[in-house]
Amino acid sequence: AGLIPPGWFEHWAGVTWATDPEGLRRNPQMLRAPNGVRLDSRDYAQAGRPYWDPAKVTAPTLLVVAEWDQDTPPAMAAAIFPLLVNSPGKRLVMLGEGTHTMLMERNRGVLFQTVQGFLEEAPAS
């Protein structure tokens, strides 16, 4: 069985495309998206320069990563986690059998439960 249940991707795509009527009117159709993340990646990550300081995070923080995530791999979260020295109640959770699109995948319930549990347990900051 695949990671994404039958029909889920098509549903997601339909809902996502509906958020950009301007992109749908273009020929060929396109989904417009902000590219600031790509610029940050080029100017900071690829240059070996951090663009944020994990030590400045003072709110409860949940890092969730999926086992097979190639976009934000578990090693990335594992490297950041110990740097969150001022985050009360920080938590790092690696979820099995998932990718970067886990919110659509068959194990998405575990993701939702993890986030819900953290929100219910986290002290107000």
Language model feature labels by segment:
Residues 1-62:
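Alpha/beta-hydrolase
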